[in-house]
Amino acid sequence: TNGYTSLYLENENFEVPAGCTAYIIKGSQRGTETYPKAVVEVFGPGKILPKKTAFILENANKKGKTITYRANVSGIEVDVTGNLLVGSATETEFSGAGYKYYIFSNGSLGQGFYHQGTRKGESMKVKAHRAGLRLPTSFSAPAKPFFFDFEAAKKDYTTGIRETHNSQPAGDNTNIIYDLQGRRVDHPTRGIYIMN
């Protein structure tokens, strides 16, 4: 209903419909900014994504409307090598060491990638023909939900993460904990911390 969805087609390629934009996520890298940058590749209308490709589809101009698309078309398919989005033709649980898992959803902080439920990024269950993000821990993998700036991706193809959010309710300033680098900590372990 907000103009974004994740898709995965197992047996057929996908032509990006008129008025739509498709995105794949190729990485996350730490730069000079406070937050990691996401490496996003953008495909406009008429581009053909190969079968077995998980992707995000934006149809921002017709939010909440059904779109018609063509699949199993002939033509030159785009290169999606390095795509970190995963999906399956059936509901599938993804897990494994060396990765953090994020589900694409319109959650409490808006459209973005979130750890699913209480899984803390250790796994995710993805519905049939939908996509999730499997980010290697060797990349800059944020511990909180994060959001890609799709508008900037259309312009630059490489974007920054807009922000991360604390799960503490607004206005509740009791017992705010910081580490010695000034970063807010929700669940401290042993060590020295700054309170409030």
Model-predicted regions and their roles:
Residues 1-18, 43-111, 117-159:
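A short, polar beta-strand/turn micro-motif
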Residues 155-196:
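C-terminal outer-membrane/trafficking sorting elements
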Residues 32-43:
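Short linear interaction motifs
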Residues 18, 37, 137, 143-146, ...:
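Generic low-complexity segments that are intrinsically disordered, proline-rich and/or Lys/Arg-biased
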